[in-house]
């Protein structure tokens, strides 16, 4: 019998200047499965980078990844950026309980 653990990821709105991002309040996933965290940023300017941070319980924010116009990968996650840059998706490839956190999508130059 395989034990399936559910992971809840909380998301938060990020606002810097006039740029506003919107995300769902929370998402759930089974352990060891990919999690796709969407972020809409329709007011993005041409010089704004898309930054993702996460905050684990009882800790400060931690950098995850950032990008400008193309898709980006690192050891922690991938960032898929839409061609018009008005939305992006943070992808956690194999979520574990250690990934349960508040995730922030923020725009800044």
Curated annotation (Swiss-Prot):
Keywords: Adaptive immunity, Cell membrane, Disulfide bond, Glycoprotein, Immunity, Immunoglobulin domain, Membrane, Receptor, Signal, T cell receptor. Pfam families: V-set (PF07686). The keyword Lyase does not apply. It comes from the Eukaryota. One of its GO terms (cellular component) is T cell receptor complex. Disulfide bonds join 39-105. Residues 20-109 form the Ig-like domain. Its main location: membrane. V region of the variable domain of T cell receptor (TR) alpha chain that participates in the antigen recognition. Alpha-beta T cell receptors are antigen specific receptors which are essential to the immune response and are present on the cell surface of T lymphocytes. Recognize peptide-major histocompatibility (MH) (pMH) complexes that are displayed by antigen presenting cells (APC), a prerequisite for efficient T cell adaptive immunity against pathogens. Alpha-beta TR is a heterodimer composed of an alpha and beta chain; disulfide-linked. The alpha-beta TR is associated with the transmembrane signaling CD3 coreceptor proteins to form the TR-CD3 (TcR or TCR). The assembly of alpha-beta TR heterodimers with CD3 occurs in the endoplasmic reticulum where a single alpha-beta TR heterodimer associates with one CD3D-CD3E heterodimer, one CD3G-CD3E heterodimer and one CD247 homodimer forming a stable octameric structure. CD3D-CD3E and CD3G-CD3E heterodimers preferentially associate with TR alpha and TR beta chains, respectively. PANTHER family: T CELL RECEPTOR ALPHA VARIABLE 26-2, T-CELL RECEPTOR ALPHA CHAIN V REGION-RELATED. This is T cell receptor alpha variable 26-2. It comes from Homo sapiens (Human). The gene is TRAV26-2.
